[in-house]
């Protein structure tokens, strides 16, 4: 019973498969008769024999699309359902073909019309020739062409001979080995590049030149035969007493004077200057400045690197170490120091520069004088100043800035062009031991072109420096960057902020210094590290300026200082003082201050003399002749008491000295 059921199932499967194939073939014939042929006639296709029309499977990867001959979806009069169902199908009155190739095994299908010999692509051209027996060339692929019905080429499975198999493991290992070799070769070339460069340079310098007498000398050396042996010959050797007129080379040859090869002379000259190569006498080379400096510690860092303290021949120096990526900035600042006649007491003194190999990296050193007090920013963090010190600091800074801005004429080798610093701030101003200042960090400075007709200085990327100290015309991009004086006006604005910072740390009478941590321009309205947009809003849109101490308006000196500061930070660049005018104004105020102090001292001395005449000398009541200790003279006591009484009666409620003449007030602080 079970056997009958199994046989029945097998017969049902076979019958179902045959029925399914018959249904598909009949559906295809109905599609050709009722839809495809009418659509082709509507499309006015006349080169096809409609009585032999059948369908074939076509491969999309070789062009089964609108370019393929007889592509069914390319017929515009068919509906979308038929186009989608017959997407990978073509029609033909000729042959269906299948091609297969090994390694990797790929099969392609398509149509070839009876009257067509070629197609648009090379593949179809080959198929047309194969199916029409028009080629005798051997092919690496296997072809099948048939015309017995719909999709006839799909019925045959092409069995290809197995090709040579390559292990993927060996392929991966081969690739890895090749990559490893390339990497090692690159590392070896990188590590030995200096040696190869030196050898190449040696070859270029000492390669034999055409017409070199070396070969002629070798060819013209007389030969003598030693013994009876044939071919045993050596050059004739001159007597010892005649060898004084020859020069011996490292190769053992001798050449009479005047005919030594030029390249040999060059080689001997180089060998005589060797520093220990083993091919000549050892000579000592002078150490560069980098080899004579001993670094003792880092003192700060900046935009292009860090600053260290060093010892150079017993003198303390500052060494600015540039990063390797900032070599253009190093060369620019070095070139400015070396070629611009920048010897001025209020400009940081340049000592030298060098390239130092530390064994790991190559460092770029710029050596300047060292000031233990550090920058003005650091100095104000630790100290307060009085009016005298304020004038010393700011007047010297203005003097250095005026020196940079002014042009000094001279010969071509000894003239200084007008310059703009472009990064004036308290961190770039050094405080010297005499409480004067020196301007440093000239890496962003700009020189006026020597050609007067060329008035362009920099490109449009002129917004450089510290954002907090940028002038309004730079923040709002209205600066005339082709006019050199515009950069100097921007320097004056930055200098006014430095003057304000220093004034905030000034202490005199009732005027107390501001907290050091808050002495930062615009800190009330900006972050510690503001962006361009934030500074633009504060300085240009809202037109704010750093806040003033209300007591400054009543101070005899600070009110004049604020007048200078307000003029220098004016929003209109043309309304600002020049750096030279700033220096002149502070010179005048400082001189008036010194005159007041001298006049006050003179008046005090005059009062003491007058009192001495009126009171006369008096003996102290406790005078004891028997006492051997030095006696105190009564007139000295009276002088001190009178000075103290004068000071007490002269003080006003605000702590200032009162007088009808302001110039009689002594210097406070």
Swiss-Prot record:
Q: Tell me what happens on changing residue 70 to R.
A: In allele p168; forms many dauer larvae
* Molecular-function GO term, any one: activin binding
Matching entries from SMART domains are given as: GS, S_TKc
Recorded GO cellular component terms are: activin receptor complex; plasma membrane
> Which InterPro entries does this UniProt record tie to the protein?
GS_dom (IPR003605), Kinase-like_dom_sf (IPR011009), Prot_kinase_dom (IPR000719), Protein_kinase_ATP_BS (IPR017441), Ser-Thr/Tyr_kinase_cat_dom (IPR001245), Ser/Thr_kinase_AS (IPR008271), TGFB_receptor (IPR000333)
Compartments where located: Membrane
Residue ranges, Extracellular side:
20-170
Keyword annotations for this protein? ATP-binding, Developmental protein, Glycoprotein, Kinase, Membrane, Nucleotide-binding, Receptor, Serine/threonine-protein kinase, Signal, Transferase, Transmembrane, Transmembrane helix
Carbohydrate-modified residues are: 49, 79, 133, 154
Query: What does the record say about its membrane topology?
Result: Single-pass type I membrane protein
Q: Where is the composition biased (Polar residues)?
A: 651-661
Q: Give the PROSITE patterns listed for this entry.
A: GS (PS51256), PROTEIN_KINASE_ATP (PS00107), PROTEIN_KINASE_DOM (PS50011), PROTEIN_KINASE_ST (PS00108)
Q: In which tissues is it expressed?
A: Head and ventral nerve cord from embryos to adults. Expressed in many sensory neurons. Subset of head neurons show coexpression with daf-4 when dauer/nondauer decision is made. Also expressed in non-neuronal cells: membraneous sheath surrounding the distal end of the intestine and in the distal tip cell of the gonad.
Q: Which stretches face the Cytoplasmic side?
A: 192-669
Q: Name one GO biological process term.
A: cellular response to growth factor stimulus
* Active-site residues from the entry: 423
Region annotation (Disordered) maps to: 611-669
What the protein does comes down to: Probably involved in a TGF-beta pathway. May be a receptor for TGF-beta-like ligand daf-7. Controls the decision of whether or not larvae enter a developmentally arrested state, known as dauer, in response to environmental conditions. Involved in regulating entry into quiescence triggered by satiety. Involved in sensitivity to CO2 levels. In AWC neurons, acts to promote expression of srsx-3, a member of the GPCR family.
Task: Give the quaternary structure.
Answer: May interact with daf-4 to regulate dauer larva development.
- This protein's name: Cell surface receptor daf-1
Q: Which organism is it from?
A: Caenorhabditis elegans
